[in-house]
């Protein structure tokens, strides 16, 4: 009898240890429900965030499209202004107007310029007015527009000063192209028209400098050197 009672007592103890208490079961159920709710809430939040982000991106794209449609680009505006100004300048010239007269009509003769000031020369040679003047030179003499321009510039500034302007014009990226072509026209004139076969002749007759003191001249010496190279190349070519 005592043995049976002992067995029953052991069974009761085992049941008490392994069977979950009601409070524990309730806590576990609540935790599971909470986790499930949290997953649902997180998924909903992510969908809302994606929808909000997508909405903002669409709104931004619509605003950008509206700006591109309603406002022309700055480049287009500047192009229209430049085109209008060029047309106005071209309208100032007569079709058969002499190049020297056109130089004054386009107010190039009133532009401030120092013959050996690189910035001022570059601004002069790259100005819109000068470009319109070049276009007019092409109409007058399409075979040698730079020769015509050189002649007109020489009449205004003098041969030595034009040579100086061309030299410093080569130093600036903005004016280098036109300066190189004017230089070619000038060297051609010196060699084939004026018959200056040596750089020393140009140094003395055009630049009005003393050959014996050549190292005392800066710009003149550079022109002398450039023309000496031209003469050498021309002699070898012909």
Swiss-Prot record:
Main location: secreted
Signals that turn on the gene: Expression is induced during host plant infection.
Keywords: Host cytoplasm, Host cytoskeleton, Host nucleus, Secreted, Signal, Virulence
GO CC terms in record: extracellular region; host cell cytoplasm; host cell nucleolus; host cytoskeleton
Keyword match Secreted: yes
Highest taxon, organism lineage: Eukaryota
Subcellular location: Secreted; Host cytoplasm, Host cytoskeleton; Host nucleus, Host nucleolus; Host cytoplasm
Function comment: Effector that enhances P.infestans colonization of Nicotiana benthamiana leaves.
Domain commentary: The RxLR-dEER motif acts to carry the protein into the host cell cytoplasm through binding to cell surface phosphatidylinositol-3-phosphate.
Family: Belongs to the RxLR effector family.
Name recorded for this polypeptide: RxLR effector protein PITG_14788
């Amino acid at each position: 009898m005592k043995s049976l009672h002992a067995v029953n007592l052991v069974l009761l103890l085992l049941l008490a240890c392994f069977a979950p208490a009601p409070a524990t079961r309730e806590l576990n159920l609540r935790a599971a429900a909470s986790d499930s709710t949290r997953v649902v809430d997180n998924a909903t939040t992510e969908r809302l965030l994606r929808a909000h982000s997508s909405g903002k991106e669409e709104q931004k794209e619509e605003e950008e499209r509206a700006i591109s449609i309603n406002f022309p680009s700055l480049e287009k505006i500047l192009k229209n202004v430049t085109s209008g100004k060029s047309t106005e300048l071209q309208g100032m010239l007569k079709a058969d107007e002499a190049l020297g007269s056109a130089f004054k009509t386009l107010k190039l003769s009133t532009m401030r310029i120092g013959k050996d000031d690189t910035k001022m020369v570059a601004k002069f040679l790259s100005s819109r007015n000068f470009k319109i003047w070049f276009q007019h030179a092409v109409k007058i003499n399409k075979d040698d527009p730079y020769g015509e321009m050189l002649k007109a510039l020489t009449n205004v500034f003098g041969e030595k000063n034009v040579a100086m302007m061309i030299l410093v014009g080569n130093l600036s990226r903005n004016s280098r192209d036109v300066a190189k072509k004017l230089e070619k026209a000038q060297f051609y004139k010196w060699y084939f028209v004026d018959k200056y076969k040596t750089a020393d002749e140009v140094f003395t007759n055009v630049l009005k400098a003393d050959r014996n003191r050549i190292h005392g001249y800066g710009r003149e010496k550079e022109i002398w050197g450039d023309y000496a190279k031209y003469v050498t190349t021309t002699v070898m070519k012909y």
